[in-house]
């Protein structure tokens, strides 16, 4: 009779304890998918920015004048943008493999989750600052600055400005993905140590 009570007590405890395996698995699938989307977004933004070169000829009566080409290497802020997104792209590859291998082993340590949470937060800062720097240059190119007599260039280099704007928009999307990853990493760490 004592064994029947023990069985019913164990069955009751099993039914009241939440299953953490399903939440961990869904969390890992979400992380892997978001890290892959992050890779695609950062790579797309890099490619769009690097291919943003445009040259123009201005025709003055009598002779055409070739003005300098507009390319991302003309601005230190856009160079920083490309480098920062390259770092984030590389990080997304490494973190995807680490996440997949950790969850395949079914042993995701608290140290690994802490490292992912810290690195995700660092990457949010890097990508957000690069997006802001690139956005500032793009805004100056679009509107100019009358106070210091910087003319707008997007009326001349329209294709270049569209590329820069597209790269910055995709980078902003990557920043949001990184923010979501950072939140998920912290929640996973919280569930692990709780």
From Swiss-Prot:
Residues 1-16 have a biased composition (Basic and acidic residues). The chain crosses the membrane at residues 32-52, 78-98, 110-130, 164-184. Its main location: membrane. Disulfide bonds: none annotated. Pfam families: CASP_dom. InterPro entries: CASP/CASPL (IPR006459), CASP_dom (IPR006702), CASPL (IPR044173). Residues 1-31, 99-109, 185-194 are cytoplasmic. Keywords: Cell membrane, Membrane, Transmembrane, Transmembrane helix. Residues 1-23 are annotated as: Disordered. GO terms for cellular component: plasma membrane. It is a multi-pass membrane protein. Residues 53-77, 131-163 are extracellular. It is found in: Cell membrane. Homodimer and heterodimers. Belongs to the Casparian strip membrane proteins (CASP) family. This is CASP-like protein 1D1.
């Amino acid at each position: 009779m004592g064994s029947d009570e023990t069985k019913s007590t164990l069955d009751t405890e099993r039914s009241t304890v939440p299953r953490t395996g399903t939440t961990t698995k869904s969390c890992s699938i979400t992380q892997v998918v978001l890290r892959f989307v992050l890779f695609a977004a950062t790579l797309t933004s890099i490619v769009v920015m690097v291919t943003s070169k445009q040259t123009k000829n201005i025709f003055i009566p009598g002779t055409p004048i070739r003005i300098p080409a507009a390319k991302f290497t003309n601005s230190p802020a856009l160079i920083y943008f490309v480098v920062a997104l390259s770092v984030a792209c590389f990080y997304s590859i490494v973190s995807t493999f680490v996440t997949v291998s950790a969850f395949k082993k079914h042993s995701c340590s608290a140290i690994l989750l802490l490292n992912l949470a810290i690195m995700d937060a660092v990457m949010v800062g890097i990508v957000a600052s690069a997006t802001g720097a690139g956005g500032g240059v793009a805004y100056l190119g679009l509107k100019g600055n009358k106070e210091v007599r910087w003319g707008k260039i997007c009326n001349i280099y329209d294709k270049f400005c569209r590329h820069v704007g597209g790269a910055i928009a995709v980078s902003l999307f990557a920043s949001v993905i990184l923010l979501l990853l950072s939140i998920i990493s912290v929640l996973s760490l919280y569930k692990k140590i709780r």
